[in-house]
Amino acid sequence: DVRAVAMLIEKAYRGPAAATGWTNEAHLLTGPRTGEDEIAGLIADPESRFVLAEQNGVLVGCALVQKDGEDGYFGMFSVDPAAQAQGLGKKLLAACEKAARAEWNSRAMGMVVINLRSELIAWYERRGYTLTGNREPFPFDEAPGALRRDFDLVELKKPL
């Protein structure tokens, strides 16, 4: 359900509900993180997959894996703040890595993370990801709700 995925992503990243989770962007950005049109487009893309996690029939986690050349790309990683710290994130990440290997024979998984989110970067490092040294500007023109403008995106990668 496109709407449920979009709502979960918003809940995990922005607004008051996000602030209850162990990691979020609420202190950096306001406004929508994504929307139903973007989610629908990603679902329709043959080189994208959403991995979903439910508890008692309720969507509590999702992540996007995409084909990115010879690698996989991991993004839109979201766990309902009420369901965090239960190992669900580790399972979602592992499922995305498995999907990238199985569907596209990906040799590595990459992602970008806001450089100020040190707790999240450390979480990925504990799962075998390393900073590549590549940085890119944060797309502030696509995020008019930036509360500060002193951050960019750093790339992490892991061999599969």
Residue ranges and their predicted role:
Residues 1-8, 15:
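A short beta-loop-alpha structural element at the N-terminal edge
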Residues 10-39:
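Conserved GNAT-fold acetyl-CoA-binding loop/helix
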Residues 34-51, 73, 149-152:
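A short helix-loop-beta-strand connector motif used in the catalytic cores of GNAT acetyltransferases and
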Residues 42, 107-122, 126-160:
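C-terminal "cap" of GNAT-fold acetyltransferases
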Residues 52, 58-66, 73-78:
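Conserved beta-strand in the GNAT
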Residues 53, 83, 87-95:
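Conserved acetyl-CoA pyrophosphate-binding loop and the N-cap/start of the following alpha-helix
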Residues 91-108, 130:
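Conserved acyl-CoA
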